[in-house]
Every structure is written in C-alpha cells, then in structure tokens.
Amino acid sequence: MATNFLRFLCLFLGLCIGVEAQESPDVHVVVNLVQLNVAVTDKDGKYVTGLRPSDFAVLEDGIAERVATFAEGNEPALRVVEPTEAEGSENRPSESTIRATPGDAPQTLNSLVAGANVFVLFDTSNYMYRGFVFAQDAIAEFVRSLESADKIAFYSYNRDLSRAAALTSDRSRILHAVRSTVAGDEAALYNTLLLTVKDATQYQGRKVVVVFSNGPDNSSVVPPEDVAEFAQSAGVSIYMISTQDAKLEPVSTVVFDRMTAATGGKAYFAKNWMDEKRAFASIRDDLAHLYSLSYYPKPNANSGWRAITVKLVGDGLKKYKIRTRNGYRPQPVRFSSELMTARPDTSQVAPSGL
C-alpha cells in the first residue's frame, strides 16, 4: 500500500512526467494567468507602500512580461492590460503553452478577488502537549485580526490531516474549530502540508498556508522539496511558525527557511508564547501589505521549471528588497482535471500506507 501511495504522489507532483512523455511525446502544458504575491521592504524591514504597476518589472526565464493586474493589500485588482490585449498575438500560447479549456477552471483576470484565502495548519501531535492552550490563543487572536476581506480555513494535523473548518468568512466557525482541537499522536507535517496546499489550489485569488509546528516531522513519506515545488507552481505562499529553538533543530530550521523563501513566505522560530503572537502579527501585516501582480506568460518553449524575477524600476527604488516566489513548473494537461476540479473533502484524511 505504501508503494501505491508513493506512485500516486509521484504522479500528483508531476515527478513522472519524463516517463509519461516517452509514452506520449505530445505532452502539452497549461499556462494561464500567473499570479505573484510580492513584498517590498526597506533596509529596516518596513513595508514600502504606494508603488504603481509601472514600478515593477517581471521576467520569466529572462523574458520581459506585461503586468495584467495589480493590487496593493486587500484592494480589488486593477486591470492594467485588457484581456484581449494580454492574450493577443504577443501572448498567444505556443505549442508548449496550450491554454486550458473552460472545464479546467483557469485563473483569469475576472477571477481575481480582493482578500486572501488563508489556510491555517495547526500541529496537534504529541509534541504539542506543552503550551497547547497558548498556541490556541495565538491562533485565535490571529484569526480575529485578519481583515474582513480574507477567508480562513482551519486544519490540524498529527499523523493524519483533519479539515476542521473549510474556507469561510465566518470567524466564529473557525474559532470554534480552533478551541475543539486536542493533542496526540505522531507528526506527518509534509504529508498533510501537501494535502493542504492541494486544497488551496481549488480557490481563485491569493492563496496562503500558515503552518504552526511544534516539532520535527517523524511520519511523512513526502520530501519537503516536493511540497515546496508544488506550492511554488501553484502560487501558494507558505508561512511557518516553529516553537522549537532554531539551534535545537538545525535541519528543520534549514528546511523551513528554504520552503518559505521559495514560495514567497517567511519562517519564524518562537521561543515562547509572546514570540508566537508576534509571529502571527507579522504574518497578518505581511498579508495586508503584499502587492499582487499577475501576467500572461509570453510564448516560451520551456515546459520545465521557469524562473521568475521581479525587479523595481528606477534608481530610487532599487535600494528596496523584494520577496516573492522564484519560479514555477507549468501544469501538465493530463493532470489538470484532477488538480483543478477536485474539491477538498471535509472529513479526515488518512493516506494509505502511512
């Protein structure tokens, strides 16, 4: 059963594309609107506000792209390029960038909405016995502090994933789910994070996963590198709060730092409950100050990993620091139906063979 699950994950994450391509050489990929969450900060880490679309330059594999929509914080997206213009001859997909059919539910200009879809993933493994109530308090305060435009889902994990509260604007439902969690069992962080990211991909607009972890992963079969790449390709930013001192968990620290940086998020290492609250407050501020940029990729024969670079234009702006995801892998058409049309179950998920 474990072998079957690994084969499923291999297909799910697109790791077997090379083998499949040998059997069917006419594999195409889907490239629709690419959305970026971009943080701009000064040397002191303070957010730079009031920037315009013309202040940003976006490159994909070194190819200059045209910004299609632009928004700051939770403001509605401003249409910078009309759909007909963005999808004209300059941006019409080549053979390797076939557009999705309506059934594939592509991200479009009209699908971008204000606010973020925030998935909170809470560690309820046996690592969490100490400080469990303080962690619940910090999460509850975070939920109450998010802007009204944001929607929230609350999941918890130990060996399995529990979808305690589906994505909703109802804060009371989320708070009830937070208070109803109990601690116990081992921790399969990367298995459950993969499933959470997959759920997030079913929704339009900005997508964020906030992980609260109190210990290392000791049960997953999914490597963190695969989770990070899937999140990058899906445009899901990952934020991680670990209650373990970075010095005590050097391996986990490196993994958390790399995963969050690759997806445009951040990692925090909290030594006490006050640090936990400060970390959640920092994430809340980040969500409120992110710039959202989108573009239709120009023809690009590269069906593999595509590097994304975002720069600020103008000598007066080059001193600022940019944080966003650094690339993505176009989605194979043969997997698009499963990934884009599946809806998350509301029950617990226990992967076979774990």
Q: What residue spans do the PLM features occupy?
A:
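Positively charged n-region of N-terminal signal peptides that target proteins for export
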Residues: 1-7
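Bacterial N-terminal signal peptides
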Residues: 7-18
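Scaffold/interface architecture of coatomer-like assemblies
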Residues: 20-354
